[in-house]
Amino acid sequence: MSEHTTTRGASDATIRAYDAADFDALVGLIGAAFGGETPDSVRFAVSAPNTTTFVAQRDDRVVGVSMAISFGASAWIGNVVVAADSRRRGLGQALTEVAVAAARGRADSVLLLALGDARRIYSRLGFEDEGLYGTWQATDATAARIEPAGALDEGRRIVATSAAPDLAEHAVALDRWATGEDRRAYLELFAPSMKVALARGDDGAETVAGYRTRKPWGTGAVVARDAATARVLLCDLLREAPGTRFEFPDANERGVRLATELGLERFKENMRMRLGRPVAGFTPQAVFKALSPAVG
């Protein structure tokens, strides 16, 4: 296990690879920082085969974490957290540097979603702004604006992959078209619980026009080729999970209009930032909900 000793002012910490004994500390750190995280979600994050996790340890205590998630030609930096009493000592930057070094060994493009003051750290490391992601949540007006099941189809129907497993492969292909990334390693783990939107053409043939994922601990991505498909998927999701928060690019103007029509309110924003080459083929207009803040 490689170790990197980092000194920042009065802060001496060892940054090393994650060990299973660190799990409870990570649940506490990540949960306190982001809220809504569960042991299941953290367990998935640290055990995913394409993820490298680092922790910062001072004495016998884990005081920080960072992750590098690889999707081949692209990679994401996620879950960068430092304990409250260890901040403003350079440890967040050190954790990010280690994760970036791991990611750049495999990827041409390294991406992340930065919140607030963290953007300054990433800018110092060479990351460039690519565009804001707004986070939206339901209001008191939302329930009345969600169409009942079956009331809104517009030539579309939703099919669960549990009933039609072959559709999951089409959803993975659609995700690659939308994101420009090969996220199969993550999506295949959620394949049995996907829902796919099929659109009927003038000739009567159906094609995959969108999908949404459901993770064991909560909701996941919503990707759609058009606003009508997105509306069907979002209404279906909000009927199932009314408290869902939607994080998607501001560049998706159709998504902004749809969220507003559904009575959602934008209450937070993150900046998508990039180190290295732009992701060829990224289509923000097709992303109506990010898979997670850690991987966009």
Predicted regions and their residues:
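A short, well-structured alpha-helix characteristic of acyl/acetyltransferase catalytic modules
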Residues: 2-10, 19-29, 144, 149-150, ...
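Conserved acetyl-CoA-binding loop-helix of GNAT-fold acetyltransferases
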Residues: 82, 88-101, 227-239
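Conserved GNAT acetyl-CoA-binding A-motif
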Residues: 103-115, 241-250, 270
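Conserved beta-strand in the GNAT
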Residues: 55, 61-69, 74-81, 198, ...
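Conserved catalytic-core motifs of GNAT/GCN5-like acyltransferases
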Residues: 111-113, 128-142, 266-278
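Amide-forming acyltransferase catalytic core, primarily the GNAT-like/NAT-type
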Residues: 127-218, 228
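Conserved active-site tyrosine of GNAT-family acetyltransferases
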Residues: 121-123, 127, 259
